[in-house]
Amino acid sequence: MIQAIIFDLDDTLYPENEFVFSGYRAVAREAAARGGCEHEAAFDCMRTAFHAADRKEVFPRLMTRFPGLSMTLEDMVRVYREHVPEISLFPGYDSLLEELGKNYRLGMITDGLPSVQRGKVRALGIEGLFEKIVYSWDYGKERQKPHLHPFALMLETLRIEPQSALFVGDNPEKDGRGAIGAGMNYARVAASTGVAPAWVQAALPGEIAMENLLQLPEILIQLPRILK
């Protein structure tokens, strides 16, 4: 019997590209304020680079396009990481989480810089919906998913057995392998923004697949039969 549902954050509860473009907006505003470019031109440059190149090349391409910028690469990274993000949950997910919380214990495990991930959670206004949030990089980047540590910590905190937990995430390589390795059940929700690399989208044996979280209540009803 499932007692707890543990969620991933990025591209599971909200579209990660919203955070990415929100960060680019913040960098564009700062760059324009310091001089050397127009806000919209800077943002368009970064957005185009995001779709055409590796994400690590976005800021260098901006600096190449506007050589008169009064910002260093370090300045851009700092503004991007420290900005207050303009992001929102996928439609219908706020009420879904509230309903699930009436019958299940809810948790979250998320990778990434803890300050950035905490900023996302605050911006989404969802911290109070979860009994426990594990920011894996609090314990070292090497312990991010699929390392067993964040999953074991969640189970220990909630004091439940692995088979009583369902982990929901978009990335089978990180979420799926970590959850299954910890003995949890795993449900994969299709990533809809394309931020995750395509190679991680292959299914894992034993995973439960769904198009979006709005299908989760029905899956929970069917789960005893699915797991037989």
Regions found by a protein language model. Name each.
Residues T110:
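Conserved phosphate-coupling serine/threonine residues in phosphotransfer and NTP-handling enzymes
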Residues I2-S95, S115:
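N-terminal helical cap/lid subdomain that shapes the substrate entry/recognition surface
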Residues M1-I2, E98, L113-P114, R118-K228:
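Asp-based, Mg2+/Mn2+-dependent phosphohydrolase catalytic module
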Residues K102-N103:
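Structured helix-beta-strand junction loops
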